């Protein structure tokens, strides 16, 4: 099982490039402290125009250790100070979840992210279908992962 933290950041109009630069700096700091970090531009569907900063961890302990370490890093704190003085976007999250099937094997240049809402009682049937879906998607080099929130809001 692995864990994921996702921040959804919507840029203020005309501030996309500044926001991208800041998020790239933050992502690099997170990487230095143990996260497998990727920054993605949402190009279609719900949230188009925003950025998703995704961090992946092999264990919950690794996630907590990383959160504490990058939060204390002077480079991270500097970007947060700049953000407070000159905000260029709105941050939602992090959404924190655990992967119950699959996990990214590496960062990909394109990610297709779909959200489905299901009751916990439906998870066994979903997990039964996952290998079949993964087999279908392998022919187009798409990884399949299923995550559930650790905290429901």
PLM region descriptions:
Residues 1-153:
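Short S/T/G/P-rich N-terminal loop/turn motif that feeds into the first structured element of a domain
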């Amino acid at each position: 099982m692995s864990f994921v933290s996702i921040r959804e950041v919507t840029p203020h109009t005309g501030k996309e490039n500044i926001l991208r630069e800041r998020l790239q700096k933050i992502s690099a700091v997170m990487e230095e402290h143990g996260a497998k970090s990727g920054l993605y531009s949402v190009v279609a569907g719900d949230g188009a125009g925003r950025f998703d900063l995704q961090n992946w961890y092999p264990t919950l302990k690794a996630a907590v250790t990383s959160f504490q370490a990058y939060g204390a890093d002077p480079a991270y704190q500097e970007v947060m100070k700049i953000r407070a003085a000159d905000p260029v976007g709105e941050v939602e999250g992090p959404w924190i979840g655990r992967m119950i099937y699959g996990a990214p094997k590496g960062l990909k240049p394109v990610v297709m992210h779909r959200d489905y809402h299901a009751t916990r009682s439906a998870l066994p049937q979903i997990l039964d279908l996952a290998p079949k879906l993964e087999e279908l998607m392998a022919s187009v080099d798409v990884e399949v992962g299923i995550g559930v929130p650790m905290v429901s809001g």
